[in-house]
Amino acid sequence: MSRSRLAKADAFEGRGNEIVTFSIDRNINYTNVCNVYCKFCAFWRREQAADAYVITHAEIDQKIEETLALGGTQILMQGGHHPSLSKQWYLDLLSHIREKFPTINVHGFSPSEFVHFRDVFDEPLEDLVRDFAAAGLGSIPGGGGEILVDRVRQKISPLKAMSDDWLEVMAIAHRHNLATTATMMFGHVETVEERIEHLDRVRVQQDATGGFTAFIAWTFQAENTKLKAPTVGSHEYLRMQALSRIYLDNIENIQSSWVTQGREIGQIALRHGANDLGSIMIEENVVSKAGTVYCMDVADMQRLITDLGYEPRQRDNWYHLVDAPAAAA
């Protein structure tokens, strides 16, 4: 049996042959100021840069209002490792969002950001996760996962959280009943064996704590970054997508990365183990800074799904279906 056929058969516990999910959310980057200078990132700016920014409450209100108007259910909120923002700034932002927009889930602050908070605020990770959750954080994204092998991380992002740190934040989040996602960015300095090691570390963590709702893999986007590597083609992406589904059979949902791969490959990934097409991405800043810009609206996403014979359904962050099924013809 081919990797793609085996992966498809294993997807979504059989439901992958019927339903493909998607979400409506907005990727809000609260600051582009960052002091870890990752070689693979084109988004970061120094604090003194002319185009450095920190989002205001008024700006985030407008972005959330636009998201709600489009039927959105959450915001994905991440940012650079800002050296000067206080812990209270983050808690105030979360409290403000919860008070003004109680129906919006804040899927925010990657493990690497929490490690940054630990170091800057000199507080234990456990306390930070608890306090952020109490202020309104609903779930944690898998950003900063890259490859969970320290040899790789020392080469591409030596000032950012190492593998054990990333996994520790996820374990703490799961203890506090915060759902999280796991990610992998591949196609740079890692070996194939290190990709497998990454998948294995995610799998072992899921066996231990069970809090990963989904896994998302994407390829490194090199344009405008300091890290140069041969471009990973669509065939290699689809192979990794299928392998992820087979290896991570303890994570229910596998998401296609149309944001980095484009519509056609994003759709084909649904035949290579993915059961979710991700978000329409009302706003995206990090990948686009690296030269990759793809856009879709709800109709586009539904069409990609139905063209393969699946039923498109909108979901929330916890993969609960939030729309009514289409009426039978």
Task: Name each model-derived stretch.
Residues 18-28, 75, 106-110, 140-142, ...:
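Hydrophobic faces of well-ordered beta-strands that scaffold small-molecule active sites
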Residues 20-59:
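Canonical Radical SAM [4Fe-4S] cluster-binding loop centered on the CxxxCxxC motif
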Residues 11, 100-104, 176, 209, ...:
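Helix C-cap/helix->beta junction micro-motif
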Residues 1-21:
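An N-cap/entry alpha-helix motif that binds or orients negatively charged groups
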Residues 22-28, 48-51, 78-88, 150, ...:
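Glycine-rich, proline-tolerant flexible connector loops at the mouths of alpha/beta enzymes
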Residues 1-2, 68, 200, 206-329:
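Auxiliary Fe-S-binding modules of radical SAM enzymes
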Residues 8, 12, 68, 98, ...:
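N-terminal cationic-hydrophobic initiation segments that often serve targeting/anchoring roles
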Residues 45-197, 201-204:
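Conserved Radical SAM active-site core
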